[in-house]
Structures are given as structure tokens and as C-alpha cells.
Amino acid sequence: MAAEQLNGYVLHRRAYRETSFLVNIFTLENGKVSAVVKGVRGSKSDKKSLLQPFQPLLIGVSGRSELKNLQQVESTGAMIRLAGQALYCALYLNEVLNRVLADEIPHPEIFVLYQQSMHALVAQTNFEPVLRSFELGLLDALGYGIDLTHDADTGQPVADNGYYRIVPELGCVYQGDIRLSGCYSGQSLLNVASENWDKDSLLAAKHITRTTLGELLGSKPLMSRELFKQTHFKSRGREL
């Protein structure tokens, strides 16, 4: 059987049996693909050196089951170079995608979003808007996006001077003109919807996406988030 050619990035790699790897690769054409890479552990093969996160790849896979055989791999461009906080953010993106994407369901819009987000992490020093935009785009693409511009009960446009509560699987619901615990200002929600970032809209977006993504990710902690907490970034009051 001829190998199917796919463009993608490694999301996760782990040891498998004595000499092999299991890799999860996010591809443009087929979404997340899981594959066995045989006979590369402990060697200096090109496959092993190329199967790294943030390296754009062209891979060749074969097999009829969900677990493919990776037959070939080559670079299609320079590795995206990340360091410090940007690296932790990129590892977070990889881990989220690896956890929430089902095998072999194409998501070309998420693939483009992922590439854009990775390059934005390289180019910017304020990473939080990149993460929040990625999370919102991911939720929208998976069908879990929340309409932050209209009241879920009445259908009326969100009022910038009102306060709203986010109801899971429903949307934002008007609570009155006085701020209550757990509510967000209409202006903050409108800013999140338009990705017009300031301190309040970033905080609102973090709470909203963490709640919604949490349902998809499950109860197991994200390793990238735990690693981030163990670094000096915690002392600066930052978290993913």
C-alpha cells in the first residue's frame, strides 16, 4: 500500500516497546494522526531527529487502522524556534490539541489557527492574547463557541453597561446593572467577542475558555500548565 502524504506537526511523542515511538501528529489533511515509528529509539536516524515539536513536516503513513505506520518523514521548513515563556505556551497548545482532537477528523481551520498562533508566539512578548484567541477559535471550530454578543434568554444584543453570567451550553444571560459575583460586564464580553484585548477582557476570556475547555479536557491536569507553575513565571503572577 502506498504511503499517504500528509503535512503536519508533532503534538506528542513517547517510547513504544524496545525500539519504537508512538507519535501523534496534527495534519492539515486528516487532523490528528497516531502512528508507530519503528526502529528509531537509540539511533541517530533522520526520522528521530525530525520528529520534534514545532517542526513542519511531510510524513508518509500507511495502514487501515487508527494506528498507522509512519514510513517516511521530511522537513518542509525551518523549525519554529521558541524559548522561555513562549515555549511553555506552545507546549500548552500542543497538549490541548492532543487531548481534545479525535483521531482522523480533518480540521483545516484549526491547523491554520495553530500555525498562526505559533508564529505569533515567536513575534510577540505579550502571550496572553495569543492563547485566548487560540482557545476561542478552537472552541468555535469544535462547535463549543459561545455567543458573547447576544443574551441567550432574550436574543437582545449584549448591553455594554449591563452584567452577565455565563451559563454552560447556553451562553450569556443578563443579571442586571449591578455587578454580582461571577458576572462579567457587557463591555468585557463584547471586547472578548471582537478580540479587543484589555485587562478585563483577557480575564473574562480566561475564565470562559477555562470552564468550557475544562469540560473537553477532563479532570487530568495539563502537564504544560504544571510545568509552567514550577518556573519563575509563577513569581510574576502569570499562569497559562
Swiss-Prot record:
Cellular component, GO annotation? bacterial nucleoid
Q: Which SUPFAM superfamilies match?
A: ArfGap/RecO-like zinc finger (SSF57863), Nucleic acid-binding proteins (SSF50249)
Family, similarity comment: Belongs to the RecO family.
Q: Which domain of life is it from?
A: Bacteria
Q: Which GO terms describe its biological process?
A: DNA recombination; double-strand break repair
Q: What sections of the protein cross the membrane?
A: none
InterPro entries tied to this protein? ARFGAP/RecO, DNA_rep/recomb_RecO_N, NA-bd_OB-fold, RecO, RecO_C
Instruction: From the record, give the cysteines joined by S-S bonds.
Output: none
Q: Which keywords accompany this UniProt record? A: DNA damage, DNA recombination, DNA repair
The taxonomic lineage of its organism, from the top, reads: Bacteria, Pseudomonadati, Pseudomonadota, Gammaproteobacteria, Alteromonadales
PANTHER family the record matches: DNA REPAIR PROTEIN RECO
Task: Tell me the protein's name.
Answer: DNA repair protein RecO
- Please give the function described in this protein's UniProt entry: Involved in DNA repair and RecF pathway recombination.
Q: Zinc-finger: present as a keyword of the record? A: no
